[in-house]
Each structure stands twice: as C-alpha cells, then as structure tokens.
Amino acid sequence: MATLQQIYSLYDTATWATQLGVYSFYTTDGSLSYLHLKTNVPVSRNTMWMVEFVGYAYGGAANIRTAIVFHTSGSVIYRIGAQNIYPGLTAQTAYTSTDGYVVIRVLASSFYYTGFVVNAYSTAPYTPNEVFRILAVSQNNNSGTGTF
C-alpha cells in the first residue's frame, strides 16, 4: 500500500518559486509499475512548473532524481519535458484529469521499497503565488491517461 503524506516544507514566501519537500511517498508494493499524481494545478490557468522527485528505489537498486516541466494555458498542457538523472524513477508525461487538473505519470524501475520526496518550482514570473500540492495518488499498471 502506498503512503502519501505532507512533510515539512520550505517555501519562498515572497514568490512561492521554490517549494521543497511538498510531499513524500513510500511503498513496498513492487507489483505495480506506474504512479499517477494528481496536482492542484488547474490546466485552465496560465502557469509553468518544474516538479522534481528525489529518493531511492531499493528494488531497482537505483537512486531517484527525475523532473518534469510543463506549461498550462487555455485548458491545454504545453511543452511537457522530462529529464531523468538516475534510473530509479522516470517522469513520463503530464495529462489532464477529468475535472481539469494536471496529473503527472511516473514509471519506477521497481516500487519494491521505494521512497522519494517531491519538490516544486514555479518557472515563470506570471505563475500565481500558490502552494503546489498533490491531491491524490494512484499506484497501478496504467501506462496511459485516465486514472484521474
């Protein structure tokens, strides 16, 4: 069973540009490969974000350091890009939930005893000053969209 919890977070209260330790994730279930994380970022708002995952995947014997960037505007997610530094977790894509929020999909080398923290960075001066949150998470074998 996956655990998602808010942990101590650090924020730049002037701009909310850097938000460290937004959430932590830990699971021992190695049978499911994908994680879908529903955020509080509405696709209809004009924003730019980089979301970073840092941790360790024991089952895959690999460090985790991956990030995904995206730009939302006019109910579309633009310029989705991912950079995977270590192979423990791969940021794959972002898609729109049925209620209009950004969902991030990641793939693990193995979720068997895997843990990571999530950091968020607003990457445009017009991104609203708001706290980035993970609203819901689903660990499953869905390699597509539609989990949320």
Predicted region positions:
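Trimeric viral appendage architectures of receptor-binding fibers, tailspike depolymerases
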Residues: 1-148
